[in-house]
């Protein structure tokens, strides 16, 4: 059961850096719905993309799976036999709850839930890979290597879904979308104190890139096609395609 996010409703003397601990895991569904505009749309559309791209006898990777929302959306939309989903997260609290969520919904496609570092996971025989608000928590210097590995592990015709919070090269646009995002959080019941404290905790661990930077990395990794397919304020999702025809 998810609880309402009140983690930052009272002043915290020493904020520290953000961690995906048990307290965050407990309120995560409420937190992300009230904090990330368009999150539900992205999750449901990841399922639609899975219906198009997941092939029989292949694997799907959900890297940074949190509580398994994207994994469940993919599994609901797989139309082929002998597929497998591998869901990975490095937070023990998230993984524990993810396993419970996955087990609560029965489906023919097996899901392997792995507690581990996504940088250490071998990607192979993949028809689809999901990075749903995950890359932004890696050190910027490590992001290209992960995308390179994903491209190498994708089968021809495979797809990567990359959802992120964006920064903007145009400062005026960046300021507008930043303020609209804060209006979104206020409209969802967050106070100025809650918004400020959470932002302070995240600023050293969530480092955002522009859409242009993401596309440049994807091209460097080898992806022949990539485009922004969803955006709401300063949040959005890209799809990157590996050339070729799925076997």
Swiss-Prot record:
Any GO BP: tRNA wobble uridine modification
Sequence positions that bind S-adenosyl-L-methionine: 39, 64-66, 89-90, 117-118, 132, 199
Keywords attached to this entry: S-adenosyl-L-methionine, Transferase
Endpoints of the signal sequence: none
Single GO MF descriptor: S-adenosyl-L-methionine binding
Keyword Nuclease belongs to the record: no
Pfam family membership, one: Methyltransf_25
Chemical reaction(s) catalysed: prephenate + S-adenosyl-L-methionine = carboxy-S-adenosyl-L-methionine + 3-phenylpyruvate + H2O
Enzyme class: transferase
Organism domain of life: Bacteria
EC number: 2.1.3.-
Assembly behavior: Homodimer.
PANTHER family: CARBOXY-S-ADENOSYL-L-METHIONINE SYNTHASE, TRANS-ACONITATE 2-METHYLTRANSFERASE-RELATED
Family of this protein: Belongs to the class I-like SAM-binding methyltransferase superfamily. Cx-SAM synthase family.
Name of the featured protein: Carboxy-S-adenosyl-L-methionine synthase
């Amino acid at each position: 059961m998810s609880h309402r996010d009140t983690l930052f409703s009272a002043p915290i003397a020493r904020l520290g850096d953000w961690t995906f601990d048990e307290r965050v895991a407990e309120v995560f569904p409420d937190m992300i719905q009230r904090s990330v505009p368009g999150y539900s749309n992205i999750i449901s559309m990841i399922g639609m993309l899975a219906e198009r791209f997941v092939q029989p006898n292949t694997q799907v990777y959900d890297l940074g799976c949190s509580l398994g929302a994207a994994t469940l959306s993919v599994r609901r939309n797989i139309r082929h036999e002998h597929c497998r989903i591998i869901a990975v997260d490095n937070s023990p609290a998230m993984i524990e709850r993810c396993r419970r969520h996955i087990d609560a919904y029965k489906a023919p496609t097996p899901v392997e839930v792995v507690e581990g570092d996504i940088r250490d996971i071998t990607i192979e025989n993949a028809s689809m890979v999901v990075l749903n608000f995950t890359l932004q928590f890696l050190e910027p210097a490590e992001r290209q290597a992960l995308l390179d590995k994903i491209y190498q592990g994708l089968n021809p015709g495979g797809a990567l879904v990359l959802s992120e919070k964006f920064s903007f090269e145009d400062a005026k646009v960046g300021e507008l979308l930043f303020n609209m995002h804060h209006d979104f959080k206020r409209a969802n019941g967050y106070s100025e104190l809650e918004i400020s404290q959470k932002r302070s905790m995240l600023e050293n661990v969530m480092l955002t890139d522009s859409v242009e930077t993401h596309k440049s990395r994807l091209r460097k990794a080898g992806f022949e096609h990539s485009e922004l397919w969803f955006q709401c304020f300063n949040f959005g999702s890209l799809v990157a395609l590996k050339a070729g025809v799925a076997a």
